[in-house]
Design a protein with these regions (language model features):
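Helix C-cap/helix->beta junction micro-motif
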Residues: 28, 133, 194-195, 345, ...
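Conserved C-terminal alpha-helix-loop-beta "cap" of PLP-dependent enzymes
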Residues: 327-366, 379
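N-terminal small-domain helix-loop-helix segment of the aminotransferase-like
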Residues: 11-97, 104, 279-280, 348, ...
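PLP-dependent enzyme catalytic core of the Aspartate aminotransferase-like
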Residues: 1-2, 344, 358-392
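Conserved glycine-rich beta-strand-loop-beta hairpin in the small C-terminal domain of fold type I
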Residues: 275, 291-302, 314-328, 338
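Conserved core segment of the aminotransferase class I/II
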Residues: 227-292
């Protein structure tokens, strides 16, 4: 039997907590409030079929051929045009999903032991993407409006220990669903500039607002001090694996080189498919329908929580968009220990501890309101309340 010797970085890799929990959802009858999956109801299958036929008829050979690592030029031009600040297409790098963007950024900016700042809590996938580079991940205290500016200044470090960047999701954050306020954005950008601290802004959910668009991106306020990440996974389909990075010109070449080494380029056909649905105006018509669907789903979960959680000492936030809300259990109760009781009642969620880089809060949990039907949401919240009563 061959004796394979693993790299030290591989020894430190761990399975995704969320992916492991998603295995539970394969149990018959389970209602999953766990995954960060967009609703399949939003997948524009007929429009994709028409766009695919058009691409193959007009540009089929190129769509199926190797292509430039930067990405399909018309798609990069479209992205630059719809972003709310002055972006040149040469600053846009197409990635194989936002997850690859995180990996590329980590490879370019992180050395072993480098200090990297994140919100409290933060996106688990970012922690996993950065982990092979072996950073020192430091959590910055956060409240309902976002990162606390004083704590950012205290944890930015200096000299050789100065943080490489702060990773932040200002809009409908995963996992909490919170949105950073206008005042906090202004203060964050000003403080980051004063500290000479780069920002990595991740915005996969920004188009999924319910009644009012969120404030303008951090990157729009200081384009040279930020790397911006976007995605088509939540507004079209995650199976496309299509995201993008907008980078300052001084950063772009190294990100491009990392992309070339990683996978040469994002699938050409998928890029042309998305370019086609942008060009023909479908995306502009489609996104408002997603907003309305998710708003109704969120309202159903809010109503169910208000009805079922009375007197249980449970609190939760009220997101203005996105896919998630954040729930806090009563003092002394563990979300990790609650999960098996919930699964016994055919409901799954993600314990919040997985989203903390340090000092996890085991009283928290993430609920997704977009994939279950409104009837299933009511059933699931009632079951969750029953599990909480039993655990109390």
């Amino acid at each position: 039997m061959t004796n394979w010797t693993l790299a030290a970085r591989a020894e430190k890799m761990n399975p995704s907590v969320i992916r492991e929990i998603l295995k539970v959802t394969e149990k018959p009858g389970i209602i999953s409030l766990a995954g960060g999956l967009p609703s399949p109801k939003t997948f524009p299958i007929e429009s994709f079929a028409a766009a695919a036929a058009s691409v193959l008829a007009t540009d089929g050979a190129s769509a199926l051929q190797y292509a430039a690592s930067e990405g399909y030029t018309p798609l990069r031009e479209a992205i630059a045009a719809f972003l709310p600040w002055d972006v040149h297409p040469d600053q846009v790098l197409i990635t194989t999903g936002s997850q690859q963007a995180l990996d590329l950024i980590g490879k370019v900016l992180i050395d072993a032991g480098s200090r990297v700042l994140v919100e409290t809590p933060t996106y688990l996938g970012a922690l996993q993407a950065f982990a092979p580079m072996e950073p020192q991940v430091v959590s910055v205290a956060s409240d309902s409006e976002g990162v606390l500016i004083d704590d950012l200044a205290a944890k930015a470090g200096s000299g050789a220990d100065k943080a490489r960047f702060l990773y932040v999701l200002p809009n409908f954050q995963n996992p909490t669903g919170r949105t950073m306020s206008e005042a906090r954005r202004e203060a964050l950008v000003a403080q980051a500039a004063a500290l000479n601290l780069p920002l990595v802004e991740d915005n996969p959910y920004g188009d999924l607002w319910f009644d009012q668009a969120p404030p303008k991106p951090l990157t729009a306020r200081n384009p040279e001090g930020c790397i911006y990440m976007g995605s088509f996974s939540k507004v079209l389909a995650p199976g496309l694996r299509l995201g993008y990075v907008v980078a300052p010109r001084q950063m772009y070449p190294k990100l491009l080189q990392a992309k070339q080494a990683a996978d040469l380029h994002t699938p050409s056909f998928n890029q042309r498919l998305v370019s086609e649905v942008i060009k023909n105006g479908f995306l502009d018509r489609h996104v408002p329908t997603i907003r309305q669907l998710y708003k109704g789903q969120c309202q159903a979960m809010m109503a169910a929580l208000e009805q079922e959680m009375q007197g249980l000492g449970v609190t939760w936030n009220r997101p203005d968009g996105g896919m998630f809300l954040w729930l806090r259990l009563p003092e002394g109760m563990s979300a990790l220990q609650l999960l098996p009781r919930a699964v016994e009642r055919n409901v799954a969620f993600v314990p919040g501890a997985a989203f903390y880089a340090d000092q996890p809060d085991d009283r928290t949990l993430r609920l997704s309101f977009v994939t279950a039907s409104q009837g299933q949401i009511r059933t699931a919240i009632a079951a969750l309340a029953s599990a909480i009563r039993e655990a109390a």
